[in-house]
């Protein structure tokens, strides 16, 4: 459908939205819900409970009444209302730029957008995961197989990645056509060599493994172990790219860790 839709929170009638790579917000949400059930003695979490709980959890979104949202000049950012964006492509483009900038900040602001149904509230993301947290996520016992509903069907995309190893998250390329920064941020979080080698070992035991890996890579370009030399400077930066229009002098783009791996 060639139209500018409202937030998926409005269209889907969902109580809570989790965005980005969801491990941290899902753990925080379920832990908070468990604590609520223990404290209240209730048998289940209601829709109202879920909305109330999510308001204090990063990397979630919810739909609120206008009188429920107190604007904080320092920590909030107002987007142009959906109705105004329907009349102006420039305002929609400005919204996209604002969202892109906030997704690239160390200390992002909360985003607010008014719709006919209420105010869409998008809480800022969690801090970048640690290597230990990322290892834990990748070390879970995945089957490495397509969903069972594809049984017997060839999936070209699966053929390309089945013997591939993801070694980091995040991308500081800032390409205009890409939304990786909105999903994963521009700051790189790396898996340990031990975790990567455990996955390589698992791949080597696959029935169709021929003895070579298709690639060791990131979500796009390979930026393993690359980072800002001075993180305090990074905290003040909202550039979508560390390499365009020219490479940032604060970027440590040393390839030695990748070569060692």
Model-based region annotation:
Residues 1-115, 122-127:
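Glycine-rich beta-alpha loop elements in corrinoid/cobalamin-binding modules
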Residues 1-10, 140-144, 148-261:
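Conserved Radical SAM active-site core
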Residues 19-20, 27-29, 120-124, 130-133, ...:
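Short helix/loop capping segments that flank catalytic or ligand/cofactor-binding pockets
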Residues 21, 33, 86, 129, ...:
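Detector for methionine-enriched segments
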Residues 27-30, 131-138, 197, 259:
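Predominant activation on well-ordered alpha-helical scaffold segments within soluble catalytic domains
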Residues 94-98, 102-164:
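N-terminal [4Fe-4S]-dependent radical SAM core
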